[in-house]
């Protein structure tokens, strides 16, 4: 791809943009946006529901924080300075909890929305009765800033690009005249505190918002624009009539870095952000295939969910978007889960995104004590800065998304006993060692401790991969992941020259496998959710994906087909049947999209490539208009449920799509099919 050497002259694009407005998007993403629009309306609650469908939000990131923008052009989720900080705009969880809208007055439904190709820069096209607008939104990226002194937050190796901590919005009127309005009403600390505005200079072009209580304990927001700002209580407003060729910029910043003061400066920052994203996406290896757009968008989303200073990968950008409409299954996913590590490394290494994989692995090494010679018991999850205490609390003053309560911050699962984490981290160590063809010396003590933990606890019950809040059980998938810990540990010990450990751990792995095959398989030859019960569980697809048994083992085939036929709704996979599982919660839940993508990969593994491809095509058709995924899908309506966008889902998408593509390629060649996570 040839990249511009200087910012494009937007005025030269005006005529072309005006002519192309009816189809102002490009490629599959643009078409998808247009085709999905009616579906989003029909799949939501009543048409006048003030909460947009979850799938209709756009996702932005600068690798240090994230935000969500509604179709109406309103920023409805932004937490600063970190993605797990308290929100300053939280309208997605309560319509009065803060917003920042920029768009035409009196119009709330855009003509088209798309990401600029290869980026997380949002472009929205608006038509009114009198004219057309194009709005672009980005969290700004710039050249690395900390030249004179070291960063206090970055632990990973500095890159060429760094977050500028500016939410930038630019507007161009490309035809006729349009009345533009801007409304910025922050609500600090999850709407527990209001905002106090004041002008920062003699003119109307800049204003500052602070929390009305203990302002020094909360971020200061600076609003800079070439509009005339009016301050009305907690709201900063602006309104102007734009004619063809007019430009507007609005920059919201929370940083020491200077915001743009003119439209030209804003256009330059928008261009450099585009350049940053396009340089990054060019690093990846993406197949020449019709599904390439889904792989690229998933890669961009995963990059957007990274916290660059530490290498952590957020499970999702949000908290408390409901898994059950108006239900209680609402959790805070703005943290880094250890179990995500294996799937992250599978997906990122597969696409050639080694740096992100290595940074995430370095984060895991940090929290496990490998990088500082400390002993830390491994937790299920951590804060993006490596924090170990994630105490859960409920925000009763917020209505919740579409009145799903409670809204939770923190996550009480951080101190649960979940035995799959040792297998996850050992598989991560193994994948990392394979990529480098060595076991880093500082990892061996940590590796050994995690294997010893698996040996000590594998016979005990736990809360399982799904973090159930009922009583601990002997979950079969947890035992499988304990086997993974011993199996990968033995392979790593051999690489390290520790023959005695390798022999000992391989023997214990065989013991665990024998126990699972005796107690975790029913009379049909199907793996069950827990010992002594015949309930199914989608996590048993990991039996084949982790190489616990080979794909041609009858028990593998029986399990994959049983899940495909018996644990699905309209062909999409449930985690488990809630009436068969004591998860400590009430209500139903949607199908888990990661499980459906796991099923795609598993079907390919057992040779059911045609069925896998059909399921994959169906899953891809459920993508949001911008090719994003929440945690769950309601199969009859296609509605997205749960936190958004979901890293786990996009990681499983990458693995599933690559499985299908490689199987297709293998059908046209004489070589041997290699699945995405094939062992050495």
UniProtKB/Swiss-Prot annotation:
Single Gene Ontology BP annotation: trehalose catabolic process
EC numbers on record: 3.2.1.28
Domain of life: Bacteria
Keyword ATP-binding: no
Needed co-factor(s): phosphate
Signal sequence interval, chain numbering: none
Cofactor details (free text): Shows an absolute requirement for inorganic phosphate for activity. The function of the phosphate may involve stabilizing the protein conformation and/or initiating protein aggregation. Unlike the threhalase ortholog in M.smegmatis, does not require Mg(2+) for activity.
Keywords on record: Carbohydrate metabolism, Glycosidase, Hydrolase
Catalyses which reaction(s): alpha,alpha-trehalose + H2O = alpha-D-glucose + beta-D-glucose
Residue span of region Disordered: 1-27
Enzyme class (EC, first level): hydrolase
Role summary: Catalyzes the hydrolysis of alpha,alpha-trehalose into two molecules of D-glucose.
Record PANTHER family: TREHALASE
Self-association and partners: Homomultimer.
Official protein name in the record: Trehalase
Native organism: Mycobacterium tuberculosis (strain ATCC 25618 / H37Rv)
